[in-house]
Structure formats: C-alpha cells, structure tokens
Amino acid sequence: NVEKKVKSKLIIIGEGPEMEKVNQFLENNPELISKIRLLGKVNDLYRILQLSDVFLLPSEQESFGLAALEAMAANTPVISSNAGGIPEVNIQGETGFLAEIGNVEAMSNYCIKLLSNEELLAQMKINAKQQAIKFDLKNVLPVYEEMYKTTIENFKGKLTKV
C-alpha cells in the first residue's frame, strides 16, 4: 500500500522465527521482491537507522521498547503497535505514531502521512532524538539514585533485626 502512494522501500533487519513467514510471503508475491530488502543481522544498525526515514515496530508484545529508542536515538521516527511499554517511549503524534496491535492499515497510513509530508517528518525526527535523550543513562541514573536515597531515608530506623 505505502509504495503505491509514496516512493519507498521496506528494509527488514534481523533474524528470527518470523523470517520463514517473510520468505514464504515473498515467494507467494514475487512482484514485491524488488520493494523489500532482507538484511538479516547487521553490524552497522545505527547507520542504517540514521539513513531510514521511518522505523516500524509492529510488536504484539514488548516490555519496554528498546528498539524504538534505538531508532529515535538515530533521529528516526517510530510507527509502532500500541503494545506493552512502547507508548511510554513512542509519543503519539510527536515522536511517531501508535497503531492498535495487528492494524497494518493504520501503520501503512501513518507511513504515507510521514513520508508524504517533509515538514512533519523533519519535526518528528527532531522530537524522536529529544525523546531518546531523555532515556540516556546520564539522565536516568540520577533519577534512580534519588529514588533509592529517598527510599533508604524513609526506611531508616523503621527496619528491625530478626
């Protein structure tokens, strides 16, 4: 759908049990082979993400969304499913878009929206990077340290030896 509206190419990175389904899909749809690249495991993921306009994360389950953060750190907006902890990372309409799990049509429409609007894409690239910076260890570590200190202070004198 996306390629019909906006010149684009789908790049699939990584390996795993789903690759068999992808290969079967391409076997059954040979006209799509020229529009999809299967890179498998890569050593230069950050560089590939930097060169990408959009990162798709159609997870059915996701605890935190580290892959989304990696894409955002490379200035790449994320179009993801609304699964697990992803909405805490990917902010709807700011760093990318969220779609209901399995809603491929919504994800396609978000791709078209981003890829056909250079101004929106440029702003989301900036927002994505800013969001990733919030999760950088040097920004997160002091928050955790303060939480631990507060917890320890609150329990001082309240603990008894058994």
Where are these regions (language model features)?
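Aromatic "clamp/platform" in nucleotide-sugar-dependent glycosyltransferases that forms part
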Residues: 41, 60
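A conserved nucleotide-sugar
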Residues: 1-37, 120
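A short, well-ordered alpha-helix in the C-terminal region of glycosyltransferases
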Residues: 106, 113, 120-134, 143-146, ...
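Short hydrophobic beta-strand element within catalytic cores of glycosyltransferases
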Residues: 77-80, 90
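C-terminal alpha-helical cap of glycosyltransferases
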Residues: 137-162
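A short hydrophobic beta-strand element within the catalytic core of glycosyltransferases
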Residues: 55-56
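Short glycine/serine-rich donor-binding loops of glycosyltransferases
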Residues: 65-68, 86
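Conserved acidic donor-binding segment of nucleotide-sugar-dependent glycosyltransferases
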Residues: 92-93, 97-104, 113-118
